[in-house]
């Protein structure tokens, strides 16, 4: 263990808070440690070794502490050596950017004959993983990677639940009461929650933030979460039952670092992932989806309700419809094949729902046990392809253990053989699979609009929560929040209409499910209906214009020659949001504005202006929003 102590205390210092001097408390004296400095290609991020502690710094600002120790092995002093420079571009079918740049300096520390640590320093963060030449008896050595998040530092962290459907409340302390409804919560001897899910956002300084997560889960690996003891937050992988023998490496531990724009715009989670394993991806087409479940929880066993949602997709010019749970119990002598045929006859591509049958089984919706065995899965996916199903939504998993991770990979790979999209629900958050398996279009792992069906809690929390997600959950991958609730479900919403419409751009998901019922969309002005018909679900570029978690956010996304700019007010008070678009768009452009009517929240305001006439400030009503289309 001693070898790890020396090295990991070293790595701890480089990613740790830089030490005080005559400068401000959050600045580091780079002169004293320059000789031990590892850096990013643009030199903005540095990993600094001082006294066997590693510190992660953005420019001159200390960010967050990181420590590694207590691994099985012998002790020796380890030093990082430069290995190579990564500089490549890769394309994504989905996500915040079509062409991503994978640029980093890679370093390696050989800890023993059996173990090395690979560290990559990117322009927007760092990533590291452990690489073993062989495992002993198939046992993965215990990992105790730990981050130090000081009391008083602002943080937005989600208490762990196996569905990752929780809030990211702002706090400056780890002392938070466990949420009793979460499955898998844990508490310390003092009674505070001590288990946290990825991602975790921490504010290190006024303009410096760090987002902690992980990426590139492969077979023989489990996903991880954070357990804390006071200020120390340890990375703890879930059960890893069958790691096998031979070479093994951990997933990448990732820290995205910089300004809020650096965090929101980062593709670091997919940068470290394996390239696409699907060669022909022409059949993978992101799009907007009409969705039965939000308004009719048991509506997918009624062909007449399904037909209404197909007709809605036709009228709004949406490419997809989702037939949700219980389609195998279709009423009145009909079958799901009848529903699928109706959709395809109307040139709408249908997707259907499955229970994963590894999580909620007893009393859970059907169909169940169709996908667990390879031979059953092959039969089911072949049948889906034959009858004209475009994709599958698979629900109710049971945590982050290796069994679930392997199962998810099996599902993505086998679905791709039959040209089926995949959308995971009741599952873990994205960890970069969308690059390796481009048919993974979206993942739930979010407290979304579905919760208007379940509890009254969401009504008052939704606006602030919506203004937090772009800085936390949606940074790491697609998010099937299911926006656009213009009407009410079991519990009311108090966000404005423009707020709800803005979410369709603000939240990135390659399958953008629209929550509301057909009649609600038909009641909206023609401008809104037409917009939904040309709304993209994947983007060429993404830029954060401004914002702060939980308060407000404005994001611009590009598709072809259009920019879509969405902003929301997460507070209960009116807010003026500055709108400076000079860095993203210039010249003679036309702007369509979708706005709230400040005199009547039930009405819209629409304007079309030249770009040069665009107001410098958007006046938002409480929990309001706005949307611009620039062409």
Summary of predicted features, one role per range:
Residues 326-496:
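Aromatic- and carboxylate-enriched substrate-binding clefts and catalytic-loop regions
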Residues 95-101, 531-555:
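Edge strands and adjacent loops of beta-rich recognition modules
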Residues 608-631:
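C-terminal beta-strand-rich structural cap/linker in extracellular carbohydrate-active enzymes
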Residues 28-269, 600-602:
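N-terminal accessory beta-strand-rich subdomains and adjacent acidic, glycine-rich linkers
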Residues 498-544:
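Catalytic cores of secreted or luminal carbohydrate-active enzymes
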Residues 1-33:
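Bacterial Sec-dependent N-terminal signal peptides
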Residues 548-585, 626-629:
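Carbohydrate-binding surface patches
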Residues 245-320:
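An acidic-aromatic substrate-binding cleft motif
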